[in-house]
Amino acid sequence: MDLSRSAAWSALVSHRQEVEQLHMRDMFMSDHDRFKHFSIRWNGLLLDYSKNRINSRTMGLLVELARQANLIEARDGMFAGEKINFTENRAVLHTALRRQPGYTLNVDGLDVPAEVDSVLRQMKAFTDKVVGGEWKGYTGKRITDVVNIGIGGSDLGPCMVTEALRPFADGAIAVHFVSNIDGTHVSEVLKRVDAETTLFVIASKTFTTQETLTNSMTAREWFLSRAIDPAHIALHFAAVSTNRTKVVEFGIDPENMFRFWDWVGGRYSLWSAIGLSIALYLGFEAFQELLRGARAMDEHFQEAPLEENIPVILALLGVWYNNFFDVPSHAVIPYDQYLHRLPAYLQQLDMESNGKRVDRLGNTVEYPTGPIIWGEPGTNSQHAFFQLLHQGTGFIPADFILPLKTQNPIGEHHDILVANCFAQTEALMRGKSASEASEELAAAGVDEETMQMLVAHKVFPGNRPTNTLLLDEINPFTLGSLIAMYEHKVFVQGVIWQVNSFDQWGVELGKQLAKAILPELQSQKESDAHDASTNALINSYRSYREGQKVG
């Protein structure tokens, strides 16, 4: 069924026309309990969604849309191990990685909880040895640096988490990440580490990913130029992979290969052995606490009524703006410097999941799907793109994320940060009218002629929606909950848009073409196999390598 032709969708189209002229400033003035009506408190987290262009009827219609999309059945099917990733014939069970032990679940004859428990125990034993100093390098020194080599979900998740939880690391081990095929990335990391005390974690499910394998071979060559003996590789390299043969060929001891499964997608994999670098940096107990936080959000998502369900509410608000206001963009603004990698992580989670143009039946969709996700930490973002948020021609919904406790209580820093966060959401909601701008200019002693010239530039339309997420603090548990919340938000939107949120065919074409172009770059023959633009670019590169400048 095309949900855009459903009764709920039609009702929302009509309702949008009803609320179009309503201003949130007036909604707050007419309802002093608006915050109470549109906020949820849960387990150390507060979601305030009262600063949205909604009323109780809006939310009722959006929840009905979710019901007509069979959201509850889809959610239950995912947790039960149904193969909802139908284009790859796979279950979607990242949630099983953090479930409480003692449940029963089989997928293709595999005992899922037993498999997960086995890998967690392997991770704990390995982590305890490395962190405790029992694991020694080839000269007998303990490990002081871990270099994670991966890309996409094998990089973005662990990198974001280790940055977010840096205050919880004891400093015994530093962690570094290499992802980009640009040789600068691996070169700069290798400058900062010592072969005698560095452990490389190669994160690649197939152990064939071009970027990861190229970077890994460079790291291997760098290591052997110092350690000499290939037998030493086993002391300094571990793998997160399913390809035992390739891992052994590389020189890695299979005892130090950590497996995961095809029912764990890359962008949902930080909870698996892909999170090994997290455990090595923070300790295994912190990694388990991250899992517990995610599990708590899983249970909330499964058990809370749709009307009080945090991921569902966030997803429905996104659908409201994306599909009924034609707003294809959503900003994420963490007011915490440790969360500076969260927007990049959410870009992949959301855009790779729901950036789809065909529905589950293979039909081209007739409505917008995944939005553009972007953002920067506050207050940096205020001095970069908030001009557009406040006075641009359209509006962009935004999530403001703020921990109430700072890990670095210095002077008034945190109070100023908090004041800015709250002020921005109020300003985006309220705006400033022409009369208010005129009064402000008059109070500043501006003459009438100048005032008439300036007033239009001083007007803020307001009525620009935001969600505010307050957390007691960012710690492993709350971060786990926050990440799982966004995972489930993306899932809900995928169900409503009727797309497969768990494949990513869109990354394949460019990779295929790159394989064809690579030998052409290294050939002596001028390229003529492509369109005029691509041929010219290839030949420009070849000419440059032969000594000719581009321009």
UniProtKB/Swiss-Prot annotation:
Residues at the catalytic site: 352 (proton donor), 383, 511
Alphabetized InterPro entries for the sequence: G6P_Isomerase, G6P_Isomerase_C, Phosphoglucose_isomerase_CS, SIS_dom_sf, SIS_PGI_1, SIS_PGI_2
Protein name as catalogued: Glucose-6-phosphate isomerase
Organism this protein belongs to: Chlorobium luteolum (strain DSM 273 / BCRC 81028 / 2530)
Pathways per UniProt: Carbohydrate biosynthesis; gluconeogenesis; Carbohydrate degradation; glycolysis; D-glyceraldehyde 3-phosphate and glycerone phosphate from D-glucose: step 2/4
Function in brief: Catalyzes the reversible isomerization of glucose-6-phosphate to fructose-6-phosphate.
Assigned keywords, A-Z: Cytoplasm, Gluconeogenesis, Glycolysis, Isomerase
Domain of life: Bacteria
Annotated GO biological process: gluconeogenesis; glucose 6-phosphate metabolic process; glycolytic process
Lineage of the organism: Bacteria, Pseudomonadati, Chlorobiota, Chlorobiia, Chlorobiales
One MF annotation (Gene Ontology) recorded for this entry: monosaccharide binding
Catalysed reaction, written as an equation: alpha-D-glucose 6-phosphate = beta-D-fructose 6-phosphate
GO cellular component term, pick one: cytosol
Cell compartment(s), UniProt: Cytoplasm
Keyword Isomerase: yes
Broad class of the protein's primary localization: cytoplasm
Family (UniProt): Belongs to the GPI family.
Group of enzyme by EC: isomerase
EC number(s) recorded for this UniProt protein: 5.3.1.9
